[in-house]
């Protein structure tokens, strides 16, 4: 829920700012946790506010960094380009494989989930679903479904309408209006 999300962000702001920043990369840049784990300083173009990401389905993709996220990392300009954005003690080198990195962050988030009594169905990846859903619903307030999906594709990095449609269906982005009248009419 919106309240739960706000409480969780507030808790992380006090107790684990680094984990919060990781979640913001997933939430605001619509990255997968494994993609966030790969990020190094050299992947950030500070002048253009862009990020080069080693993605799931293509070698690399370039994404803009939204202003509300960029403000939190602009101080890193000039840091060792080979440092990872997300290492156990902050921005530094981290010599281990990607699976270990993702597992580390998953376990770190698990401790926060325990504080909030959240079940195993919630993970860092859930924030990607949540924020894509929020963005979709916000865009739908003023755009047609097709226009919404066109805009969303640019933001999320989905490369085809088919892939985006499947993703949106899988996370129940659009719910129908109450259809009680249809049931009543069909029952006559």
Question: Which residues does each predicted region cover?
Answer:
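Basic, Lys/Arg- and aromatic-enriched nucleic-acid-binding interface segment
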Residues: 2-33
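Basic, Lys/Arg-rich DNA-contacting stretches centered on the C-terminal catalytic core
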Residues: 11-13, 34, 47-71, 78-79, ...
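Short, basic (Lys/Arg/His-rich) helix/loop patches that form interaction surfaces
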Residues: 13-14, 79-81, 106-154
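Short, charged phosphate-coordinating catalytic segments
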Residues: 26-48
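Short, polar N-cap/turn motifs at the start of nucleic acid-interacting alpha helices
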Residues: 43-48, 141-168
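Catalytic-site neighborhood detector that most strongly recognizes the C-terminal catalytic loop/helix
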Residues: 56-58, 156-182
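Active-site/catalytic core of tyrosine-dependent DNA strand-transfer enzymes
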Residues: 66-119, 138
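C-terminal secondary-structure termini that scaffold catalytic or DNA-interacting sites
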Residues: 91-93, 181-188
């Amino acid at each position: 829920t919106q309240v739960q999300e706000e409480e969780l962000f507030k808790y992380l702001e006090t107790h684990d700012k680094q984990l919060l920043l990781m979640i913001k990369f997933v939430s605001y840049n619509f990255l997968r946790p494994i993609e966030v784990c790969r990020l190094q300083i050299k992947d950030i173009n500070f002048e253009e506010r862009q990020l080069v990401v080693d993605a799931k389905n293509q070698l690399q993709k370039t994404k803009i960094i939204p202003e509300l996220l960029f403000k939190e990392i602009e101080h890193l300009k000039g840091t060792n380009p080979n440092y990872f954005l997300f290492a156990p003690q902050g921005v530094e080198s981290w010599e281990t494989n990607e699976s270990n990195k993702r597992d580390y962050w998953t376990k770190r988030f698990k401790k926060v989930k325990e504080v909030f009594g959240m079940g195993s169905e919630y993970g860092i990846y859930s924030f990607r679903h949540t924020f894509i859903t929020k963005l979709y619903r916000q865009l739908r307030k003023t755009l047609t479904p097709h226009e919404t999906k066109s805009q969303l594709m640019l933001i999320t990095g989905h490369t085809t309408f088919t892939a985006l449609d499947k993703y949106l269906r899988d996370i129940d982005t659009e719910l129908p209006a109450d259809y009680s009248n249809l049931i009543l009419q069909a029952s006559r």
